[in-house]
């Protein structure tokens, strides 16, 4: 099996590059949580997926990476969800609205990049993420 094992300095630089992309523009990044099938890639326009909630990152989103981990600063929840549905994925955007990346959303223990205590979102109810980390793998 072919693989790459980047040095810690490179892993930190990769995480910091994501952080730089999150912090583009003059305001905070956002986390848009959707139901439905995740887009083919982060450049694919949203189709029939339903926007359930929008959360707001701090500005900047995170301090510099340490030990190849980007630890997000506080994330402001959505006090009133946009729609009712099952959260399955998220699109993370910078303050200009440009997509930075898409990722999976699952309930705690489900292995998603974003984990929620429940993926059942109810319109008008609060949605929150208490913490967030992004880890650049060692292989």
Regions found by a protein language model. Name each.
Residues 1-88, 94-139:
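Small cysteine-rich, disulfide-bonded extracellular modules of the LU/uPAR three-finger superfamily
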